[in-house]
Amino acid sequence: MTYILKIKPARAENRHGNELEYYPSEQEELVEEALRKLACDRLNGVYLGPGAGVQFTMYELREEHRKRGHSMSHDELKRSLLICRSAGLYIERKGGEREVILDSSIFPTVMISSRRDWKADPKNARCYVQFNPLVTASIEVLTFRQFDYETLMSYSCQLSRWLHKRLYHNYVNAEILNTYHFLLKSVKRDSGLLNNERISQDMKYLEQTLEELNKKNIIYGFQKEIRRGKYNRIDDVLYKLMPSIEFTNEMKKANKRAADIHTKSPARLPAHRKL
């Protein structure tokens, strides 16, 4: 099954008051991850109407980013929230007749306290964000998985975070003798983060990412098999990842948690519910 994703840029003011177009970036990714973490803490997660969301203060959001080494100012956080509110996501299933799966922003609803309220009482000036409908759907049909958030937020490389989440979601049968395989071209296609002119540069960047995963004890090591095409040029590279003991233990815990949730959960909405 093939899907097409289109992203429409948001329009927001910069610090000089000029309105510009912004595509969601690494900063917006970090803001969304932090908000999902806050939703799991101290009963901040809420359901209002049909969607899951989170109530928080800008102080809490700033502190969460500061603790993870990604400090942002009040204005930077506000701009990221507004970009997530305005940037459009359009997903359709490609086939004989294209079927629209999703037409929404990253955050359909955003309520931000005023700067005056924030300055007067920063720890109690409440804000609210409604998550994307796909997040709500994942909660309703229990397709989410437990993963190591602290390690995720400690990476210096955006591709490291992408691969970290990919492994936690897909590598459910992680064992020391069961390696995880992927092709360089598949990472380039799926992540959108390998945009170098030469394949050798993509290899270098990806292998720097794998070294970072190794330092974080996610993988024990990796091997690569270079595949050559015409004129002996590199056509693709097959990577084989060897999981660390720490990662295999984490996956066993995540699998048990997922099994417990499915066993103990009440009746759920059907998996193919229209959004």
Task: Please tell me what each predicted stretch does.
Residues 1-275:
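Charged, alpha-helix-forming regions
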